[in-house]
Amino acid sequence: VFENSAAIRGQKRTPGVQRRGQERRRAILDAAEALLAEQGYEAATLKAIGERAGIPTASMYHYFPDRHQVEAELLRRHMTELDTRITATLEKPEAQTLREAVDVMIDILWDYYRAHRSCTELWFTGRHQMLVELVRSFDDVQAERLWRHLVNRGLASADTPRLAVQLSFEVGNRLFDVAFRRTPQGDGATIDEARRLITAYLESYS
């Protein structure tokens, strides 16, 4: 009887405990985002994140084993938002040419990166293998979607290989990296060169 009563009391506490745990995880991610945006990648240590969130370092390990787990979770959050924006754009296409389609995709990414410096810090400065794999997976998914979109709408030749769009994302990443190393808002001249390079490359299959 006593065991059953204790179990019931434990079950009643569970939703509250879970809610507090979720709130703390959000607080940690928000603190990490703020530190990355204000002070850069190197400053966003697990200790600094905990201090910003008001959570003792020892307690931080209950939610995230190390800073890389925090970074990965925060990057996933950014990727979810980016995916939502890309999906909305592809579902209501306005681009009438390949160049316009390339511009639209670049603008989505550029606008988001400029508004979320923490994302650029993780995407381009963070070199942990976990982040690298997340970026690669995201790019592969988006490249597949964009390739189908371009071919289905006749904006790219049906002979355009999927690999060409995948490589375009790879090149785009490198040029975005250069652009944001040049200026905090992303160097416009470098972005313009990215537009020309990627468009010319994909048009070569026409």
Where are these regions (language model features)?
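Amphipathic alpha-helical packing segments from all-alpha helical-bundle domains
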Residues: 80, 84, 100-115, 129-154, ...
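N-terminal positioning helix adjacent to the helix-turn-helix/winged-helix DNA-binding module
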Residues: 24-27, 31, 142
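Amphipathic alpha-helical linker/stalk segments
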Residues: 74-101
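N-terminal intrinsically disordered/low-complexity leader segments
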Residues: 1-23, 206
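Hydrophobic/aromatic-rich alpha-helical bundle segments in the mid-to-C-terminal region
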Residues: 121-125, 132, 153-198, 205
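Helix-turn-helix
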Residues: 27, 35-69
